[in-house]
From Swiss-Prot:
Transmembrane segments: none annotated. Its EC number is 3.1.26.5. Disulfide bonds: none annotated. Consists of a catalytic RNA component (M1 or rnpB) and a protein subunit. This is Ribonuclease P protein component. GO terms for cellular component: ribonuclease P complex. Residues 120-145 are annotated as: Disordered. RNaseP catalyzes the removal of the 5'-leader sequence from pre-tRNA to produce the mature 5'-terminus. It can also cleave other RNA substrates such as 4.5S RNA. The protein component plays an auxiliary but essential role in vivo by binding to the 5'-leader sequence and broadening the substrate specificity of the ribozyme. One of its GO terms (molecular function) is 3'-tRNA processing endoribonuclease activity. Gene3D superfamilies: 3.30.230.10. It catalyses: Endonucleolytic cleavage of RNA, removing 5'-extranucleotides from tRNA precursor. The lineage of its organism: Bacteria, Pseudomonadati, Pseudomonadota, Gammaproteobacteria, Lysobacterales. It comes from Xanthomonas oryzae pv. oryzae (strain MAFF 311018).
Length: 145
């Protein structure tokens, strides 16, 4: 379980926790959305922090709401080292209740990329950049081309 391994926990310092912190993000944030989730973010020099809002309108059962939050926390835990600083608040939409865990995770990643918090992945099927040879790297015995 995560409690026994502190490296796998989601630290308190990486969470938006109080009503005042949520209010600051909602009042001063930029927004982007997806059919499953909505992201409110506020960039800053602070380490990245995540807040979640999953209401009973999304799923009336606590089990369903907790599943959505668990998937988002797990995705955030793996992204913390490469994520840009600031506060990120995810608001789940009712379609998230019927979505699978990978669909929720993919929607979260899409929103973070759209917000500029994550680097864009390399396009599949593209060639790697060509290695150029600098003239100083050629040995003296090799002829110049």
């Amino acid at each position: 379980m995560n409690a026994s391994n502190p490296c796998r926990r989601f630290p308190r310092s990486a969470r938006v926790r109080t009503r005042a912190q949520y209010t600051v993000v909602f009042d001063n944030a930029r927004r982007t959305s997806d059919p499953l989730l909505s992201l409110h973010w506020r960039t800053g020099d602070t380490p990245p922090r995540l807040g979640m809002a999953v209401s009973r309108k999304v799923d009336t059962r606590a089990v369903g709401r907790n599943r959505i939050k668990r998937v988002l926390r797990d995705a955030m835990r793996h992204l913390l080292p490469e994520l840009a600083g600031g506060d990120y608040v995810i608001v789940a939409r009712s379609a998230a209740a019927k979505a699978t865990n990978p669909q929720i995770r993919d929607a979260f990643l899409r929103l973070l990329r759209r917000a500029g918090a994550l680097p864009l992945p390399a396009a599949p099927g593209t060639m790697p950049p060509a290695r150029t040879m600098h003239p100083s790297s050629l040995s003296p015995t090799e002829p110049d081309l």
